[in-house]
Swiss-Prot record:
GO molecular function, one term: rRNA (guanine-N7-)-methyltransferase activity
Protein's gene: rsmG
UniProt keyword Repressor, yes or no: no
Name by which UniProt lists this protein: Ribosomal RNA small subunit methyltransferase G
Any matching Pfam family: GidB
Location(s), subcellular: Cytoplasm
Length: 210
């Protein structure tokens, strides 16, 4: 198990306060209790939530250090959405909407938001029904949710209106990108993951149909 340290968090996310680090450590303990009941993440990764999930999510703050209006789709156990909520608490006026239709997972997300007074809101709807409920974001995130082509279909109402996507992807991301260009054109920046040697964060912008 990787050690919890402010340094590891700052290596992933950039400048982060000691207070935010302490809050994330408390969140990790709370997460472990809930995960034993409702299986928020696979048991194979539950023993290293700090490295595999929290730090993996936190690296988005380094990639985009300024945006204040975010939406995370298919938020599940809160990665990356809840982690970003903790980090966005350090940005004046920042907030994130968490779209999650599973009632138990939405309840978990809402409990964490209330416990830590996070700048976040749960949108308990299916993703395709959430667009009218979420003000136009600057950043859209998703992790371990769907193929890139499906993600683009789900997020097109936002990405074709000026938002950028930050999507965690694994070793097969190039095939997903190639599949997506049959339907969409977009600008793409590949950010190597700081936690997974085979992973990337795909930054997509200027989405338009072809």
């Amino acid at each position: 198990m990787s050690s919890f340290s402010l340094e590891s968090l700052q290596d992933a996310a950039g400048p982060v306060s000691r207070e935010t680090f302490d809050r994330l450590v408390a969140f990790e303990a709370m997460f472990q209790k809930w995960n034993r009941s409702i299986n928020l993440v696979a048991q194979s990764t539950a023993g290293d939530v700090w490295q595999r999930h929290i730090l993996d999510s936190a690296q988005l703050a380094r990639i985009e250090p300024n945006a204040t209006h975010w939406v995370d789709i298919g938020s599940g156990g809160g990665f990356p959405g809840l982690v970003m909520a903790f980090l966005l608490a350090e940005r004046a006026g920042a907030s994130i909407d968490l779209v999650e239709c599973n009632r138990k997972k939405a309840s978990f997300l809402q409990t964490v938001i209330g416990q830590f007074n996070l700048p976040a809101r749960v949108v308990a709807r299916r993703i395709k029904d959430s667009h009218a409920l979420v003000p136009q974001p600057q950043i859209v995130t998703a992790r371990a949710l769907a193929s890139l082509s499906v993600l683009l279909e789900l997020t097109a109402p936002w990405l074709t209106s000026g938002a950028r996507g930050l999507f965690h992807k694994g070793r097969d991301y190039r095939a997903e990108v190639q599949e997506s260009v049959n339907r969409w054109a977009f600008d793409l920046v590949e950010h190597p993951s700081v936690t997974d040697p085979h992973g990337v964060i795909l930054e997509l912008s200027n989405l338009r149909p072809v």
